[in-house]
């Protein structure tokens, strides 16, 4: 099964404008961080359709009744540290009730291959609802795949992936493992370079969003 990929940049000019700002090498980190946050909010609008909702009746200030929607239960945002921090914030601004979990991983490069080592996670013992894995750059897909595995192993009722830019290679890797996991991204770029950066991409999202180069 091939994962369903929805490229939001093809659906709204606002996403393309956000991408323009983020891709521009002259964008400074305060503005970059701000637009990563906006990208998270845009993703929330689209990913919301994947989550469970129930109809609830409320009374308006005029004493009239109206039926609208509310989350069917807890929703978890699983952020990949650290560039995802403003992205998670943007998503949570649209769904303030969302619970936030974190996963941190490092690359371990070996001759001929790349491995991912998770060195920190703050996850519920068991998920009692859907999980949205958020990572600005879905490059090789290995870190995101590990976060998906952790969420599924802990009982997430559904897992959805949100990114700002995804590579075709990363999407194919996710599909090979979790073909039933939908992927939402503002852009789908064609390739990775020798350092596993997405091309054309936007550079190192972590350095640019946090303003600190390790």
From Swiss-Prot:
Allosterically activated by GTP. Pathway: Pyrimidine metabolism; UMP biosynthesis via salvage pathway; UMP from uracil: step 1/1. SUPFAM superfamilies: PRTase-like (SSF53271). Binds 1 Mg(2+) ion per subunit. The magnesium is bound as Mg-PRPP. Its EC number is 2.4.2.9. Its cofactor is Mg(2+). The keyword Glycosyltransferase applies. Gene3D superfamilies: 3.40.50.2020. Uracil binds at residues 198, 203-205. One of its GO terms (molecular function) is GTP binding. It comes from the Archaea. 5-phospho-alpha-D-ribose 1-diphosphate binds at residues 107, 135-143, 204. It catalyses: UMP + diphosphate = 5-phospho-alpha-D-ribose 1-diphosphate + uracil. One of its GO terms (biological process) is UMP salvage. Keywords: Allosteric enzyme, Glycosyltransferase, GTP-binding, Magnesium, Nucleotide-binding, Transferase. The keyword Lipid metabolism does not apply. InterPro entries: PRibTrfase_dom, PRTase-like, Upp_A, Ura_phspho_trans. Catalyzes the conversion of uracil and 5-phospho-alpha-D-ribose 1-diphosphate (PRPP) to UMP and diphosphate. NCBIfam families: PRK00129.1, upp. HAMAP family: Upp_A. Belongs to the UPRTase family. This is Uracil phosphoribosyltransferase.
């Amino acid at each position: 099964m091939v994962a369903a990929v929805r490229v939001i940049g093809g659906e709204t000019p606002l996403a393309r404008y956000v991408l323009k700002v983020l891709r521009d090498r002259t964008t400074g980190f305060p503005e970059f961080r701000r637009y990563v946050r906006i990208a998270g909010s845009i993703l929330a609008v689209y990913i919301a359709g994947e989550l469970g909702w129930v109809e609830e009746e409320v009374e308006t200030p005029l004493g009239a009744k109206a039926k609208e929607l509310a989350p069917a239960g807890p929703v978890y945002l699983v952020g990949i540290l650290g560039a995802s921090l403003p992205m998670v914030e943007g998503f949570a601004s649209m769904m303030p009730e969302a619970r936030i979990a974190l996963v941190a991983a490092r690359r371990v490069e070996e001759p001929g291959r790349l491995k991912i080592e998770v060195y920190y996670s703050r996850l519920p013992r068991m998920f009692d609802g859907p999980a949205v894995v958020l990572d600005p750059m879905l490059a090789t897909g290995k870190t995101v795949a590990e976060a998906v595995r952790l969420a599924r192993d802990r009982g997430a009722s559904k897992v959805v992936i949100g990114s700002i830019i995804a590579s075709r290679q990363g999407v194919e890797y996710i599909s090979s493992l979790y073909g039933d996991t939908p992927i939402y991204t503002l852009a789908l770029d064609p390739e990775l370079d020798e350092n596993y950066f997405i091309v054309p991409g936007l550079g190192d999202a972590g350095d640019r969003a946090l303003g600190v180069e390790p």
